[in-house]
Design a protein with these regions (language model features):
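N-terminal amphipathic/hydrophobic targeting modules at extreme N-termini
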Residues: 4-6, 10-11
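Positively charged n-region of N-terminal signal peptides that target proteins for export
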Residues: 26-35
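C-terminal motif of bacterial Sec signal peptides marking the signal peptidase cleavage site
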Residues: 45-47
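Secondary-structure boundary elements
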Residues: 63-208, 243-244, 296
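Hydrophobic/aromatic-rich core segments of domains that either
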Residues: 166-169, 173, 178-184, 193-203, ...
Length: 308
């Protein structure tokens, strides 16, 4: 009887310990799960806060908003700003505000706002999906990736179309090599041919498969920007050795600007047939969309662009 009772008591104690261990394991698992969920929420909240503003500088963001309101006041008729009634993320709205604040009035009246919103979303997608996206500083992305217009070309949906064709071609490359590869792709699409003074749109250049230097450089800048590579068109109105002009492209790579001949691929950047004339050029300039405060010498500031 004693042994039987003892065994029962021991069994009871063992059972209690087993239950205790199970309960403790469940409690620990619940604590770990809750801690994981809390950490996930905190990280997600931090990420949301980090992506909340397209323009992180409060002063500059306020200046852009004031310029946007002035543009709205100048165009009170019609539904020219109806795209802002759509549901969009806060960073998308700030980017759209930036574009509308400084784009020419003709671009507001001639094109539907959905075109600009689609371009913004494609730019943000490229920044996320391209391996160099996180390395592009905010101001460089704002002035040299986001803008749709390059020169005086007609605007089109080239950014979205070019991205789908180029994304897999450049994904495994460094930013430097991606610039070279995009220029090879541009050479496959467009060759140099003199044309009239009107600048064709990027898609029109692909359709005709030719263009003068101003059209080739407009096309190449659009292609580079489509995959999140900062790019700008550079223009000289007159060479030192001849009464002629030229336009080419500069691309931003890891903190430096490199030049390249548009649709004229070379094995490295900072190499082109115009190297010599460019070093002796009297004037080379580019028009940067919006109010730009970079290290370059500023030649002029207008309501829509900064000439450097």
């Amino acid at each position: 009887m004693h042994n039987s009772l003892t065994l029962k008591r021991q069994g009871y104690l063992l059972t209690n310990k087993y239950i205790h261990y199970i309960c403790a394991d469940k409690i620990n698992a619940m604590i770990k799960t809750n801690l994981f969920l809390l950490l996930f929420v905190l990280l997600a909240g931090t990420s949301c806060n980090r992506q909340q503003h397209f323009i992180s500088d409060d002063t500059f963001r306020a200046e852009v908003e004031n310029d946007f309101r002035a543009k709205q006041a100048a165009l009170p008729d019609g539904n020219l700003f109806s795209v802002f009634n759509q549901k969009m993320a806060s960073d998308e709205k700030e980017a759209l505000t930036f574009l509308y604040a400084y784009m020419p009035i003709g671009d507001i009246t001639d094109y539907d706002g959905q075109l600009y919103l689609d371009n913004i979303r494609s730019s943000f997608r490229a920044r996320v999906e391209m391996p160099w996206g996180d390395s592009i500083p905010e101001d460089i992305f704002r002035h040299f990736v986001l803008p749709v217009r390059v020169n005086n070309e007609n605007l089109d949906e080239s950014r979205m179309i070019f991205y789908e064709e180029l994304k897999d071609r450049v994904k495994g490359l460094s930013l430097y090599d991606a610039v070279l590869e995009v220029n090879h792709w541009c050479h496959e699409k467009v060759i140099y041919t003199p044309s009239d003074a009107r600048t064709s749109s990027p898609l029109a250049s692909v359709k005709t498969a030719y263009g003068r230097c101003g059209e080739e450089s407009t096309f190449t800048v659009a292609a580079l920007r489509s995959v999140g590579i900062p790019a700008r068109q550079v223009y000289t109105p007159r060479w030192a050795h001849t009464d002629d002009n030229h336009a080419w492209v500069e691309a931003w790579v890891n903190g430096k600007w490199y030049f390249l001949g548009a649709c004229e691929p070379e094995p490295v950047l900072n190499l082109g047939w115009f190297n010599g004339p460019a070093y002796r050029g009297m004037l080379m300039h580019t028009k940067v969309f919006g109010k730009y405060n970079g290290p370059e010498e500023v030649m002029d500031v207008t309501d829509g662009y900064t000439e450097i």
